[in-house]
Amino acid sequence: MAHPLDFRGNISSEFSYFGRSSVGTDNFNFNSSVAAEVEVTHDLNDNIRLIAHPFARWDEHDDERSRFVLRELLLSANFSNWEINAGVGTVFWGVTESRQLVDLINQTDAVEATDNEDKLGQLMLNVKWFSDYGEFEAFLLPRFEERTFKGPNGRPFLGITVDRDLTTFESAQGDQHLDVALRWTHSVDAWDIGLHYFDGTLRDPLLQVTQTDTGPVLAPRYLLVQQAGWDAQGLYGDLAVKTELIVQGGDEVDLHVETVSGIEYTWVGALSPMQEKEMLPDDWCTPDTRNPFKKLICNDRIDLGLVLEYLWDERGESSNQPFQNDLLAGVRLSFNDTATTDALLGLVQDLDGGATTLSLEASTRLFESFRLSVESTKFFNTGGDASLQAFENESYIKADLSYFF
């Protein structure tokens, strides 16, 4: 039996504006970029599927961001209660909004965005077993992918260039160290629960200041860790309770605990711009209207969600990441329209140093094949937080228009 290719993808144009000049070598305020990605799936037979997901980007200023990467090239086989995946794949774990502590399989593609949501493909052998007692997974990860970083002309700029040529590893095997991960997930009543164990090279590098002939740079060092953790989400009507926790340690990493926990409450239909539609002309609230303003006015049900999360790291100021004692408060709007319009406004407050990060993400579909996304981040009071001081001049607004095919 013939199995046709399933071919889909998108082409996007991105435009960014930075309100202040950077301390980098190229003090531009505007940046443009073009990207394309394709997802191809082909069923070789009823049990075996081939998946390919290439991605390419050209950036106006940052050479490190102009590249071609393979996010997935995976052979997936399903037999009874078993699934085997071999090749380059992408795996996501986590339930919280602000930070996913348990999401450790894939490396962050940091040249794409600052929210750590974009990932590089990971070479893997993944075996899953589905049972009445949950889903059991095992991973063998034979090659490590180094984190990408923006170049000296890239923005947002760290304040000092990361030189990947100076990368070191705790493991004598370098990027060839064999990492191992185990995971169990199960649903119990209102809760979805996940447990994991990881032994291998930590994806988050330690960035060490190093002097070179051209001045100071940051040299990445990747450490070996053993990590155990859990993630859980409970749904009680309109209330979602979320939590992630890890215990992590190694020869060069002090044994410590990190956690993110919080809630999200959704008021369904909390905002209804125009309940009395008889006040409007007869042709306004037709189901097929394409006018975005009319869609907003005529919407019967706009859901309002409130998000609250607490982030904690036992190491405090000695941690190599900024979320040691922080609070996230956010508002999510879901317009429930045919354009799937949504928006998320979030504020992260450092409860020790006083730094504040305000972010906005919003998107809507235009016509049948286009989607417009807007993202903005503003940094306040960064002087008291060493990990955020570099972003003092890096507040930005970004618009992305994508065509899907």
What residue ranges belong to the model's regions?
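Repeated loop/turn-to-beta-strand initiation elements of outer-membrane beta-barrel proteins
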Residues: 5, 46-50, 81-84, 133-136, ...
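Residue-level signature of outer-membrane beta-barrel architecture
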Residues: 5, 40-42, 76-79, 88, ...
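Membrane-embedded beta-strand positions of outer-membrane beta-barrel proteins
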Residues: 9-11, 52, 84-86, 127, ...
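Transmembrane beta-strand segments that form the barrel wall of outer-membrane beta-barrel proteins
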Residues: 11-21, 49-59, 71, 108, ...
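Residues that define the transmembrane beta-barrel architecture of outer-membrane proteins
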Residues: 26-34, 66-71, 80, 119-123, ...
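Outer membrane beta-barrel
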Residues: 41-156, 189, 307, 377, ...
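Outer-membrane beta-barrel "beta-signal"
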Residues: 127, 263, 270, 391-405
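Detector for outer-membrane/organellar transmembrane beta-barrel domains
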Residues: 236-349
